[in-house]
């Protein structure tokens, strides 16, 4: 897929301090990858470019996309970059335990590295999920001379892990920072996108979804009381009409809900799979996604993924973070979104015509 004019402006941006406000399904990963390629092909030394991703799988995907253009560029999580700095300083990284959190790594970097060479070009993905400690590490320790931060605070779903989306929101408002929009939504049908907007726009102007409909599909949204048997029947009906099990996501808020739905579908002889994103490499993720099974996932595990038909189990909008999590869930669906709520009484409606 070629870049649109908004993506091209970001890829070739000349300003030193840039924040990209990227909505769901707007081509953020492609834009970030092509920005790295642009810098590399422009002649920026590879060791002067640092790309911080949120997960190892995202780093692996970017390296695969870049091919030879990415060779010699640091691409990895903030944990792995802290490890890299320690290793480069001569610190024995074998002393670092795999389970150490970033607080411990940050302390070790402070203690063992007297001076960190400022990064010439820093690119940061998922900036909305950055916490205060990571922010200090980036701006007070590695001190990038040029930075481009990609963010969508509407998808900030890690406050429980210390993320502060206000950091990137406030940075983008500074006079010296240039902001670029990335708003063309190429995934969601029009009705699905409008449903997602209604969820998130309640949070005020900083969270307003300015996404522009670009998928060319209308999409369908149905809000129903939760009935597991009805969901199973709906999946089976779609299979009878030559759709695939792999066309379906069942998205849950908690692991216990995942287990409940997974074993229920198994007992209904519906092939299904579940996994945690952190446990998979990018290649393993692609393999699992391509298998002809219904994917039963937490909403957090589904972030960054998409499917034709999505069922969301009993999600409520009772605070800011839950609205962001709900927004992520809704924007996974391309053609059909079934939004369920806890059942008060049995209610069966044939909502989908599979002809």
What is each model feature region?
Residues 155-159, 166-210:
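Conserved coupling/interface region of RecA-like P-loop/ASCE motor cores
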Residues 2-12, 16-20, 74, 83, ...:
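Conserved helicase NTPase motor core
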Residues 35, 65, 133-141, 234, ...:
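A short acidic, amphipathic alpha-helical/loop segment
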Residues 1-12, 16-23, 177-184, 205-252, ...:
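Inter-lobe coupling/hinge region of RecA-like P-loop helicase motors
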Residues 45-48, 143-146, 152-153, 174-179, ...:
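Short glycine-/polar-rich loops that comprise or flank the Walker A/P-loop
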Residues 1-91, 328-331:
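P-loop NTPase Walker
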Residues 26, 56, 190, 240-343, ...:
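Core RecA-like ATPase module of SF1/SF2 helicases and allied nucleic-acid translocases
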């Amino acid at each position: 897929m070629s870049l649109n004019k908004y993506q091209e402006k970001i890829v070739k941006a000349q300003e030193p301090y840039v924040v990209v406000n990227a909505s769901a399904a707007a081509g953020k990963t492609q834009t970030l990858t092509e920005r790295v390629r642009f810098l590399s092909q422009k002649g920026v030394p590879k060791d002067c470019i640092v790309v911080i991703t949120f997960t190892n799988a995202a780093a692996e995907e970017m390296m695969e996309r870049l091919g030879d253009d990415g060779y010699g560029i640091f691409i990895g999580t903030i944990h792995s970059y802290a490890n890299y700095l320690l290793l480069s300083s001569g610190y024995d990284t074998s002393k670092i335990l795999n389970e150490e959190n970033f607080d411990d790594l940050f302390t070790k970097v402070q203690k063992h590295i007297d001076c960190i060479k400022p990064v010439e070009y820093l690119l940061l993905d998922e900036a909305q999920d950055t916490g205060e400690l990571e922010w200090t590490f980036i701006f007070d320790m590695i001190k990038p001379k040029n930075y481009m931060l990609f963010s969508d605070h509407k998808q900030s779903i890690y406050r429980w892990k210390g993320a502060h989306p206000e950091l990137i929101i406030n940075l983008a408002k500074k006079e010296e920072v240039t902001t670029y929009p990335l708003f063309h939504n190429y995934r969601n049908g029009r009705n699905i996108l409008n449903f997602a907007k209604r969820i998130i726009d309640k949070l005020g102007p900083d969270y307003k979804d300015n996404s522009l409909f670009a998928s060319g599909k209308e999409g369908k949204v149905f809000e129903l009381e939760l009935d597991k048997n009805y969901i199973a029947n709906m999946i089976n009906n779609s299979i009878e009409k030559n759709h695939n099990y792999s066309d379906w996501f069942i998205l849950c808020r908690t692991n216990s809900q995942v287990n409940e739905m997974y074993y229920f579908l198994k007992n209904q002889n519906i092939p299904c799979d579940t996994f945690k994103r952190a446990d998979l490499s990018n290649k393993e993720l692609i393999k699992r996604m391509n298998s002809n099974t219904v994917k039963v996932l937490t909403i957090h595990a589904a972030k960054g993924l998409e499917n034709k038909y999505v069922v969301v189990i009993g999600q409520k909008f009772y605070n800011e973070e839950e609205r962001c999590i709900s927004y992520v869930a809704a924007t996974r669906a391309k053609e059909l979104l079934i939004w369920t709520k806890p059942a008060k009484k049995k209610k069966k409606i044939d909502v989908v015509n599979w002809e």
